[in-house]
Each structure stands twice: as structure tokens, then as C-alpha cells.
């Protein structure tokens, strides 16, 4: 399985930092992953649905640690790129010579 596209949608909330959509093998889309700032740093939360008892159940999730870690690395790298793009816009009229 290859993550062929990652789209990051930053939000300005205390713990929720972004929503993410990924495409797998150019043929399967997973929406509503979240980049969360927790006690030990950033992590990825899988899309989930609230149950009648108030708990949450993942809609989709990796079946093993290796896949979860690969997804997390790929998504957080794209999140960092997106922040750098938005955090340091170049002033109008400047260019590198």
C-alpha cells in the first residue's frame, strides 16, 4: 500500500491542528484524519464515529504498527511542509537572484 496523495487542511485550535485526506494507491480516499497536539507531541487520529454511549469507534485504521508509523511519518511530513508554506510567505515583488 502506498500513500499517493496527502492533503492537509490546517485549523487554528488548541489541540486539533489539521484535518487530513489521504489517497491510497491512487484509488482509495480516506477523509477526516486529524493531526492532534497531545501531551507528547503531534499524532494522527483516525476518522471515527461517535456511538450512542458517547464513545468513539474508528471508521478506518491501520491493522499493524508498521503501517500506522508509515502513515504518521508521511502525514506529519506533509503537515510540516504545509505549515512552512503558510508560515513564511514571501513578500510581493521579491525574488532570488
From Swiss-Prot:
Any GO BP annotation: sporulation resulting in formation of a cellular spore
Record bears the keyword Transmembrane: no
Record-linked InterPro entries: SpoVG, SpoVG_sf
Keywords: Cell cycle, Cell division, Septation
The organism's place on the tree of life at top rank: Bacteria
UniProt xrefs under Pfam families: SpoVG
UniProt-listed PANTHER family: SEPTATION PROTEIN SPOVG-RELATED (PTHR38429:SF1)
Family of this protein: Belongs to the SpoVG family.
Protein task: Could be involved in septation.
Stated name of the protein: Putative septation protein SpoVG
Species in which this protein is naturally found: Anaeromyxobacter sp. (strain Fw109-5)
Organism placement in taxonomy: Bacteria, Pseudomonadati, Myxococcota, Myxococcia, Myxococcales
Name of encoding gene: spoVG
Amino acid at each position: 500500500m502506498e500513500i499517493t496523495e496527502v492533503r492537509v487542511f490546517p485549523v487554528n485550535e488548541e489541540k486539533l491542528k489539521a484535518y487530513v485526506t489521504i489517497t491510497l494507491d491512487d484509488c482509495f480516499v480516506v477523509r477526516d484524519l486529524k493531526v492532534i497536539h497531545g501531551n507528547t507531541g503531534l499524532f494522527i487520529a483516525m476518522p471515527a464515529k461517535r456511538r450512542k454511549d458517547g464513545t468513539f469507534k474508528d471508521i478506518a485504521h491501520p491493522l499493524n504498527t508498521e503501517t500506522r508509523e508509515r502513515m504518521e511519518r508521511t502525514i506529519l511530513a506533509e503537515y510540516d511542509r504545509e505549515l512552512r508554506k503558510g508560515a513564511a510567505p514571501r513578500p510581493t515583488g521579491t525574488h532570488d537572484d
